[in-house]
Design a protein with these regions (language model features):
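Enzyme catalytic cores with a strong preference for nitrogen-chemistry domains
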Residues: 1-350, 358-371
């Protein structure tokens, strides 16, 4: 971390449906690549290990057993990786199947987050195979360890306290009150969303707005990893539209249909500062949340994020004209109110010939036009 910045990434491999061994090979390649580029947090798409479009194969025990075996392989491979990895995997708990995000750090599963809202409309039929994770709080044996399976979990970095991670999965974001809202109220500053969002005309812009708006509402960073190439195209197409947003700004976005890995430097210290400043933002824990802890090395990565030299001056001429008119209107309305309040009929402006006095004349002229 340098000056509060954490490098994060979103990715999806080119998968083969219902081939966990092949998919895991591709997952491990991406883990190696992103680690070399300095990523501290990596999020994969929904049900990455199996593929999202397995259909009724999700009801077959051999597939589920192999997914579990390959998950353990990923866990083992991350033992010497200084990063947190979120990967999608079907998990059986008490004879019920859950669509889960598995959170891994340094060869250990920190926790398993089940999907809460299962779409069962239009082209979706998840309830045919999966159970909602709402209210679930159980332990499941993965390898030699019992792991918590619960949607209400946050993952706190011990040596970077501003880095608090939580997960929701695809449809969870599209409902009226997403789980990420509660996650943020419980302290999460980074939301990870392993997703499999089908591609339709005009959905790209809607999805982008949804992710960026949620990051703004939560004063959080949002890492959205979308399913892509290799998923079945029997009914729909997946584009791999990854997004990384921070407090309403889109920091990185994948070009659709390319299987591109996207990276961004998120500023967790700034997010924490913004929450402190906004006194209406809920503080403390909300509800019954389980806190898991992990650690990361403090990396002094080169920051690739760029910032505009003039942040309040848009590059686009039309937007610039609107911004200037907005500023002029704000000042004019403020002066108009003072003139009305004091019953003033005249104004005297000292002219120096500089920009400030020129602006003062323009503001005064518009204020009198508004009276």
């Amino acid at each position: 971390m340098k000056d509060g910045f954490i490098k994060v990434a979103a990715a999806t491999p080119k998968i083969k449906v219902a081939d966990p061994a092949y998919n895991t090979e591709e997952i491990l390649k991406i883990i190696d690549e992103t680690e070399k580029k300095g990523a501290s947090v990596l999020v994969f798409s929904e049900l990455t290990i199996s593929g999202y479009t397995c259909g009724d194969l999700f009801l077959q025990q051999p597939l589920l057993t192999e997914c579990k075996n390959q998950l353990l392989r990923i866990v083992k491979a991350t033992k010497k990786k200084d990063m947190l990895v979120v990967v999608g995997c079907p998990i059986i708990v008490n004879q019920k199947l859950y669509n889960c995000a598995v959170v891994i750090n340094r060869g250990e599963i920190l926790g398993i987050v089940p999907k809460t809202h299962l779409p069962n409309y239009s082209e979706f039929y998840e309830l045919r195979h999966f159970t909602s994770g709402e209210g679930l709080d159980e332990m499941v044996m993965i390898g030699d360890e019992y792991i918590t399976v619960c949607a209400n979990q946050v993952f706190t970095c011990e040596n970077i306290p501003e880095l608090v991670i939580a997960c929701e999965i695809c449809e969870d974001l599209w409902v009226p009150l997403p789980p990420s809202t509660y996650h943020a109220m419980a302290g999460a500053t980074v939301i990870c969303n392993p997703s499999a969002s089908v591609e339709t005309t005009t959905k790209e812009s809607y999805r982008r707005s949804l992710v960026s708006n949620q990051s703004a509402r939560l004063l959080a960073a949002y890492i959205y990893a979308d399913a892509g190439e290799g998923e079945s195209t029997q009914d729909v197409v997946y584009s791999g539209h990854h997004l990384i947003c921070e407090n309403g700004s889109v920091l990185a976005e994948a070009k659709r249909f390319t299987n591109e890995i996207v990276y961004a430097d998120i500023d967790v210290q700034k997010l924490a500062a913004e929450r402190r400043k906004m006194t209406s933002f809920p503080g403390g824990k909300v509800g019954d949340y389980i806190e898991q802890t992990f650690s990361l090395k403090i990396k002094e990565n080169k920051i690739t994020r760029t910032f505009p030299k003039a942040p309040f001056v848009p590059d686009n001429q039309d937007e610039r004209d609107k911004r200037c008119d907005e500023i002029l209107s704000l000042q004019s309305m403020g002066l108009k109110k003072r003139l009305e309040h004091t019953n003033c009929k005249h104004a005297v402006v000292g002219i120096s010939g500089g920009l400030d006095s020129t602006l003062a004349v323009l503001v005064t002229a518009r204020a009198f036009d508004l009276l």
